[in-house]
């Protein structure tokens, strides 16, 4: 059985842990407890191949900026997560997460994941954002960001409803077992750290 290491990164409270717990247990966790570091494992079949998927949850908070990269060696695929209803977490995709991954683990495939899909159409959430002159991140904005950071895919999901959830992990696995499907960089710019 092929083992694949998948590391999940993104701002605090974007739903990384909920994503992993919902996927591995089919249950949505009740309360928010910030993660320092956690590991999950799932045996799955993708395209007829048995895979042991090692899932590494990381802390998004700045306090752990020096600790988090210790989980990056030997990573096969990264999920960079942002919340669809948090424009700030979306900006941090290339403000923080993409540069950090490029620095510590260049040339590892990245899947860009928009979480909390169920909240995009939620009236209360929209009103709360409008008060700050903000709007939920659109699918088109996600696709544009995917191209900007040269990610393999952009996917959206909800850990609460599980919509799109299995697809996120199936595509993460496919980016490793079918590397020929990876997009070729448009140029040889590589990572730019500012």
Swiss-Prot record:
GTP binds at residues 10-17, 57-61, 115-118. The modification Cysteine methyl ester is found at residue 191. Residues 192-194 form a propeptide. Disulfide bonds: none annotated. SUPFAM superfamilies: P-loop containing nucleoside triphosphate hydrolases. A motif (Effector region) lies at residues 32-40. The keyword GTP-binding applies. InterPro entries: P-loop_NTPase, Small_GTP-bd, Small_GTPase, Small_GTPase_Rho. A lipid is attached at residue 191 (S-geranylgeranyl cysteine). One of its GO terms (biological process) is aggregation involved in sorocarp development. Keywords: Cell membrane, GTP-binding, Lipoprotein, Membrane, Methylation, Nucleotide-binding, Prenylation. It is found in: Cell membrane. GO terms for molecular function: GTP binding; GTPase activity; protein kinase binding. It is a lipid-anchor. Gene3D superfamilies: P-loop containing nucleotide triphosphate hydrolases. One of its GO terms (cellular component) is cytoskeleton. Interacts with pakB. Interacts (in GTP-bound form) with rgaA. Belongs to the small GTPase superfamily. Rho family. Overexpression promotes the formation of filopodia and membrane ruffles. This is Rho-related protein rac1B. The lineage of its organism: Eukaryota, Amoebozoa, Evosea, Eumycetozoa, Dictyostelia.
